[in-house]
């Protein structure tokens, strides 16, 4: 499934937001959990699907305010 890709993309955005002082450190896992629970993860995603999931996850992680 695509959960590792979702985790990675959400984590990268959350850390960027933390370093920019937009969120607190303890909000990083909240953003990751939100993305994992809201992005649909196919059981065997294609490369194109993974790229789309990455874009969707980064957008959601940027917009989510824990």
Give short role names for the model-derived ranges:
Residues 1-66:
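Catalytic, metal-anchored helix/loop core of enzyme active sites in primary metabolism
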């Amino acid at each position: 499934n695509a959960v590792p890709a979702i985790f990675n993309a959400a984590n990268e955005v959350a850390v960027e937001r933390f370093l920019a002082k937009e969120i607190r450190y303890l909000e990083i896992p909240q953003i990751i959990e939100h993305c994992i629970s809201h992005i649909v993860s196919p059981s065997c995603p294609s490369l194109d699907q993974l790229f789309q999931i990455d874009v969707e996850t980064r957008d959601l992680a940027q917009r989510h305010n824990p």
